[in-house]
């Protein structure tokens, strides 16, 4: 008689994905972030569900309902701060996961990579509409500024913005629909994540060497299940330290002031995880040009499989490309800092130079470095 997990139609799927999955024997800690992202998503859905039980999506009561959650609901303060900081944790894991994909050439699995880019867009959309819900000053003005960018689209722009707002400004209709979007999107993300895994398991995981490991695979359980569990425990410890000791460290103090359409905050800026894209948006003086650059800053990732010129998959043995990769990371950190600064010299020119460097490294320097390395190795 066969084991139930190998014969039962439902358990068989789980078995092939998480138990008997053939896995490369040498994947490092950088491969932990996929499972950590799954954990983050579950955490966000659960905390979000409990918050939705007490939240009201009305302009008059939204702010006070969040205050009520923090003051009157049992452990409401904990649920709220876990959800707010859980978004930061999600994006930290997401950016490391993408960085690992670039470093080790995982983008050559095109279907998995493209679904990943779609997941990134959806996660960013979810985080944006979620940030509007507490209805503080930065929520209101962030929603106004970012949705207004769509008015740069020729001919239909203004109509599109008013259609999204549900009126002539960000108001009750906007808040209600943003709450609806914020509730449904994580489930769409979960469905896409399953498709992401499905395509990954079609090809098998990549590994740090970037070479096929078909002849030398080990089962996922107990080796990598234990490793993922250890990673999850470590991340939860760091996360709970942030939530319990520094819950407002990553937030904006302006969001503790109720939304007021008559009073503009001195510096309108998004959460830290959007600052790099915001800096790229602001670096172009033209509105439409800025919007295009903003979208391209993420969409440029889709070009990576087609710009791969090296005969090696991974950057592990390619010092020139490694230098460019870490320059790219530094550049993104610089853009993140610039995004939080006011629009004045010298920040304007630094932001513009960093934006040019960002696109140049991905689209010009990295493909060139691959060709140079091939030449040096006489390939």
Swiss-Prot record:
GO biological process: one example: mitochondrial electron transport, ubiquinol to cytochrome c
Cofactor: heme b
Matching InterPro entries: Cyt_b/b6_C, Cyt_b/b6_C_sf, Cyt_b/b6_N, Cytb/b6-like_sf, Cytochrome_b, Cytochrome_b_C_euk/bac, Cytochrome_b_N_euk/bac, Di-haem_cyt_TM
GO cellular component, one term: respiratory chain complex III
Keywords attached to this entry: Electron transport, Heme, Iron, Membrane, Metal-binding, Mitochondrion, Mitochondrion inner membrane, Respiratory chain, Transmembrane, Transmembrane helix, Transport, Ubiquinone
Subcellular location: Mitochondrion inner membrane
Amino acids binding a ubiquinone: 201
Keyword Transport: yes
Co-factor remark: Binds 2 heme b groups non-covalently.
Gene3D superfamilies, per database record: Cytochrome Bc1 Complex, Chain C
Molecular functions per Gene Ontology: metal ion binding; ubiquinol-cytochrome-c reductase activity
SUPFAM superfamilies: a domain/subunit of cytochrome bc1 complex (Ubiquinol-cytochrome c reductase), Transmembrane di-heme cytochromes
Residues the entry annotates as binding heme b b562: 83, 182
Main location: mitochondrion
Amino-acid positions noted as binding heme b b566 in the UniProt annotation, renumbered to this chain: 97, 196
Entry's transmembrane regions: 33-53, 77-98, 113-133, 178-198, 226-246, 288-308, 320-340, 347-367
Membrane topology: Multi-pass membrane protein
Extra remark beyond the main annotation: Heme 1 (or BL or b562) is low-potential and absorbs at about 562 nm, and heme 2 (or BH or b566) is high-potential and absorbs at about 566 nm.
Subunit text: The cytochrome bc1 complex contains 11 subunits: 3 respiratory subunits (MT-CYB, CYC1 and UQCRFS1), 2 core proteins (UQCRC1 and UQCRC2) and 6 low-molecular weight proteins (UQCRH/QCR6, UQCRB/QCR7, UQCRQ/QCR8, UQCR10/QCR9, UQCR11/QCR10 and a cleavage product of UQCRFS1). This cytochrome bc1 complex then forms a dimer.
Record family assignment: Belongs to the cytochrome b family.
Designated name of the protein: Cytochrome b
